[in-house]
Amino acid sequence: MSKNELKKAAAMEAIQFVKNVNIVGVGTGSTVNYFIDALAEIKHQIEGAVASSVATENRLKEHRIPVVDLNSVSNVDVYVDGADEFNKHFYLTKGGGGALTREKIIAAAAKRFICIVDESKQVDVLGQFPLPIEVIPMARSFVAREIVKLKGDPVYRQGFTTDNGNVILDIHNLTILNPVELEAILNNIPGVIANGLFAQQPADDLLIGTPAGVQLHHRK
């Protein structure tokens, strides 16, 4: 099976967890796009979807799936999103698509966070994929210097602006031995809006697409 077929299999499996719930949080990315396409088939069974990006909102609307604002709902029943990396502790690296801040907000608001991935995203130690951080534009150079102090190599994602009007620094060559600690350190740098580590609040469930089928892992 191709990587795209594995992504699609994981996304399709996630549909069973959102049937007959009120509000579904929807992430951003190529794997999530398969989920949105499948969600369209059961859109009559949900009240609405909270989108983590403009791109996701547009795709939901193309399928005539009702989109609701997070401020207008009291609960998000399930949040479904992909990841750029994951490890055995359910810690994730996310934000390759630049939507990390809104993704993190909806994941925190949701009762359950289901991460859909293909097996190629599994790593022993996070950091092989560059870690994105969303930064207020005026703080970009300052934050970059602080990242260098942490032994990372920050690269400005030129020509990209987040849906929140900010910029992205991608941190390369950073071996993340303690994701929970590093997430807090990065968040405490003035000018950082959010970073792509989902360790303080990891995924609740992993749906992993493999050639042998989709594996479900639940965090204990």
Swiss-Prot record:
Record SUPFAM superfamilies: D-ribose-5-phosphate isomerase (RpiA), lid domain (SSF75445), NagB/RpiA/CoA transferase-like (SSF100950)
Binding residues annotated for substrate, in chain numbering: 28-31, 81-84, 94-97, 121
Taxonomy, superkingdom: Bacteria
UniProt KW keywords: Isomerase
Record's catalysed reaction(s): aldehydo-D-ribose 5-phosphate = D-ribulose 5-phosphate
Enzyme kind, highest EC tier: isomerase
UniProt-listed Enzyme Commission number(s): 5.3.1.6
GO cellular component, one term: cytosol
Single GO biological process annotation from the record: D-ribose metabolic process
Catalytic residues (UniProt): 103 (proton acceptor)
Pathway note: Carbohydrate degradation; pentose phosphate pathway; D-ribose 5-phosphate from D-ribulose 5-phosphate (non-oxidative stage): step 1/1
Molecular function (Gene Ontology), one example: ribose-5-phosphate isomerase activity
HAMAP family: Rib_5P_isom_A
PANTHER family, per the entry: RIBOSE-5-PHOSPHATE ISOMERASE (PTHR11934:SF0)
Subunit structure, as described in the record: Homodimer.
Family affiliation: Belongs to the ribose 5-phosphate isomerase family.
Role noted for this protein: Catalyzes the reversible conversion of ribose-5-phosphate to ribulose 5-phosphate.
UniProt-recorded name of the protein: Ribose-5-phosphate isomerase A
